[in-house]
Amino acid sequence: MSKTDNIYSKRRAQIDGFSFDEQVVQVFPDMIKRSVPGYETIINSIGTITERCAVENSNLYDLGCSLGAATLSMRRGLNKAGCQIIAVDNSQQMVERCEQYIHAYKSDTPVQVLCDDICNIHIENASVVILNFTLQFLTPEKRLNLLTNIYNGLLPGGVLVLSEKFVFEDPLNHQLLNDLHLDFKRSQGYSELEISQKRASLDNVLIADTVEQHYLRLRKAGFKHNNLWYQYFNFGSIISIK
């Protein structure tokens, strides 16, 4: 059972860079629900997208799967025979807990959970690929190669769901949407100390792009059909079709 996120509730003399360690694993469902506006809507919609876009005898990938919320949503929405889901995360603690969650729900769809760098995964015979708040934690110079690997491994008509935190070129828009996000976190019970310390921990760890930067990179990777299908303040999700 998920615990309440109070990791940054006490003042710290030194703020280390954010990592998906055992402490975060313990509170992750609570943390992401209270930190990412619209997270549950995106997760539920991944199931709907899977129902529409998965094809028989194909692979589905959840890259940066954390505790498997998107994996479980895909599996619930999957209505095609002969498919398997491959979930990948580079945090051993996340993978171990993810496997527990996956095994707790019975399904005929096999799920393989791998502890690995998502850049090492060869995407093949894929109908659906999920990058749910994952690309932003990858160093920028690695992002295009990953998207190219995904594009090459997708079947014609296959889809990539790319959910991210965004920044905005217009300073007024950026400030307003950022402030609205902070208001959201306050409404979820986070204190000013928690908000400021968490933000400091994410500096140079989470590197966000503009929507336009995402579109440009996706086009370079080969995706010609890209659409922002969901946005809530400075968080959103793009669907790209091969």
Swiss-Prot record:
Leading EC class: transferase
Q: Where does S-adenosyl-L-methionine bind?
A: Y39, G64, C65, S66, D89, N90, D117, I118, N132, R199
According to its UniProt entry, one GO biological process term is: tRNA wobble uridine modification
Q: Which Pfam families match?
A: Methyltransf_25
Write out the entry's keywords from A to Z: S-adenosyl-L-methionine, Transferase
Assigned EC number: 2.1.3.-
* Catalytic reaction annotation: prephenate + S-adenosyl-L-methionine = carboxy-S-adenosyl-L-methionine + 3-phenylpyruvate + H2O
What Gene3D superfamilies does this protein's entry cite?
A: Vaccinia Virus protein VP39 (3.40.50.150)
Molecular function per GO: carboxyl- or carbamoyltransferase activity; S-adenosyl-L-methionine binding
- Family, similarity comment: Belongs to the class I-like SAM-binding methyltransferase superfamily. Cx-SAM synthase family.
What this chain does, per the entry, is described as: Catalyzes the conversion of S-adenosyl-L-methionine (SAM) to carboxy-S-adenosyl-L-methionine (Cx-SAM).
The family database entries (HAMAP family) matched by this protein are listed as: Cx_SAM_synthase (MF_01589)
Could you give the subunit structure recorded for this chain? Homodimer.
Q: What is this protein called?
A: Carboxy-S-adenosyl-L-methionine synthase
Gene of this entry: cmoA
